Design a protein with these regions (language model features):
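Ser/Thr-glycine-rich phosphate-binding loops at phosphate-binding pockets of nucleotides
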Residues: 149, 156-158, 241-249
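Short loop/turn positions at the edges of beta-strands in beta-sheet-rich folds
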Residues: 90, 149, 229, 239-241
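Pseudouridine synthases involved in rRNA/tRNA modification
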Residues: 1-33, 81-84, 205-207, 213-220, ...
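RNA pseudouridine synthases
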Residues: 1-201, 305, 312-315
Length: 323
């Protein structure tokens, strides 16, 4: 039998969600079975899957010891790069400027060096990430951007901050702004574009429809033309909705794909010589007014932005970022 005392960071979440993160070596289906079979108790009593944990709760796990493999000593993240461009940090959150070319989470091609592992390494060195404590909160990202997109990513240092950030993003109380270079010239200097986005069944690609379709979700993208030449335009984008690949797929469907985009661009097989990555950067976020007291209410009406964008001249970026 193993006993766990719930701390502040792990409170205010469902017991099943906590156990799935904590018991990483046990399949979720087996965890649910253990709860149903009364092999997991809360404060000595039978619990429901939907039970929300409180600080000080005592979990009793009547599970075979061999299932508690020591996963806390996984130090693979320490092999990741130490390169981390921090825009802002406090005891609850980190705001990072992610360079293009780096994935945010491990995948089949990038199993070690990714943004979240760099953050874990940074916090571990600062003694803020306790890998020897299975109950300690593992740093988590509140938002994601594509591997070849650069810009702002927010990380939470504790579960309450993550919960607040997730709710703020869901309710569109954290606004995200991008700059991008696209092919051609837009029909209007500024506009709010509406369409519907869905997933391709056979490819990791998003499809756009300008009429409602089953399985498609509405997207809204606001743009302003900042500068244009005969062949290309610099756009400022505000995401009204935030779907995967929204900006890239939406602009491509409008006939103005982002330069350097090998998936949604004109040439899907070769990257533009001038643009080794897609010319898209999440350069600014703003927090709306916090209407209720919370752990992060000091961020109310705050604004954060990157210091530079790889595809723009530094002085020019300083000028247009104030617009």
């Amino acid at each position: 039998m193993k006993e766990i005392v719930i701390n502040k960071d792990d409170s205010n979440q469902r017991i099943d969600k906590f156990l799935i993160k904590y018991l990483k070596n046990i399949p979720p289906a087996l965890i649910y079975k253990y709860i149903r079979k009364n092999r997991i108790k809360i404060n000595g009593k039978k619990c429901k899957i939907s039970y929300k944990l409180s600080e000080g709760d005592v979990l009793n796990l009547y599970i075979n010891d061999e299932l508690f493999l020591d996963i806390s000593h996984n130090r693979e993240f320490l092999e990741s790069s130490s390169d981390l461009n921090i825009i802002y940090e406090d005891k609850n959150i980190l705001i990072i400027d992610k360079p293009p070319g780096i994935v945010v989470h491990p995948d089949q091609n990038f199993k070690v060096d990714c943004l979240i592992n760099r953050i874990k390494k940074y916090l571990y060195i600062k003694n803020e990430y306790k890998i020897n404590d299975n109950t300690a909160f593992s740093p988590a990202l509140a938002n994601r951007i594509d591997r070849n997109t650069g810009g702002i990513v927010i990380a939470a240092k504790n579960s309450e901050s993550l919960r607040i950030l997730n709710n703020k993003i869901k309710n569109r109380e954290i606004k995200k702004y991008y700059f991008c270079m696209v092919n051609g010239n837009m029909n209007k200097n500024s506009d709010i574009l509406t369409a519907y986005i869905g997933k391709s069944k056979n490819e990791n690609i998003s499809k756009i429809s300008f009429t409602e379709k089953p399985g498609y979700k509405k997207i809204v993208t606001k743009y302003t033309v900042i500068k244009e030449t005969i062949y290309e335009s610099l756009l400022k984008i505000e995401l009204i909705t935030g779907r995967k690949h929204q900006i890239r797929a939406h602009l491509s469907a409008m006939g103005h794909p982002i330069l350097g985009d090998t998936k949604y661009g004109i040439n899907k097989h070769n990257v533009y010589k001038k643009y080794p990555y897609q010319a898209l950067c999440s350069y600014k976020i703003t927090f709306d007014t916090f209407k209720e007291p919370s752990l992060l209410d000091y961020l109310s009406n705050r604004e954060f932005q990157t210091k530079k964008i790889w595809f723009l001249d530094d002085e020019f970026f300083k000028h247009i970022s104030k617009m």
